[in-house]
């Protein structure tokens, strides 16, 4: 019973987990944060940058192909959201712009991101569906469990793909090694026969 209660508490803690970072951005530089995200997942975030007169910070969210999912210029404090189309690595970049005549100052950037189950407002769902607090918690745990199962399925699929790739690579390496050995044996045989004919022509051997 105690173990079951511990697992429930752990799942509830995971359900409320989010990713928060704070970093310093030097003048006229950019810093990008990357993360692998599953397909059809909602990503939400909040950002805040320290204000320095005359300095500008832009942000952009994009995929590995360069498709822009969210973008805003001259940011100070705000929110953003986008939906991932396919499973791949997505990045959020913050870009500092300082005029040439101005001496740049390092700025602080804070970012809080949520994705998937973390983006749902279970309090609002509970009020709309007239659910009891315990039912809301169970709904949250159900969604979290489904998310964990999907993550494991995806990890298993990627493991199988990597294993298939390794097996194909090993097969190709083995084939290439056998082919190389056959070529070397053929070349050595040809050299022996050629030298034998040459020495016979010179009457150095019978």
From Swiss-Prot:
The chain crosses the membrane at residues 173-193. Residues 1-20 form the signal peptide. It is a single-pass type I membrane protein. Keywords: Developmental protein, Membrane, Signal, Transmembrane, Transmembrane helix. One of its GO terms (molecular function) is cargo receptor activity. Residues 30-140 form the GOLD domain. Pfam families: EMP24_GP25L. One of its GO terms (biological process) is endoplasmic reticulum to Golgi vesicle-mediated transport. Eca and bai are essential, though not redundant, for dorsoventral patterning of the embryo. Specifically required during early embryogenesis for the activity of maternal tkv, while the zygotic tkv is not affected. Belongs to the EMP24/GP25L family. This is Transmembrane emp24 domain-containing protein bai. The lineage of its organism: Eukaryota, Metazoa, Ecdysozoa, Arthropoda, Hexapoda.
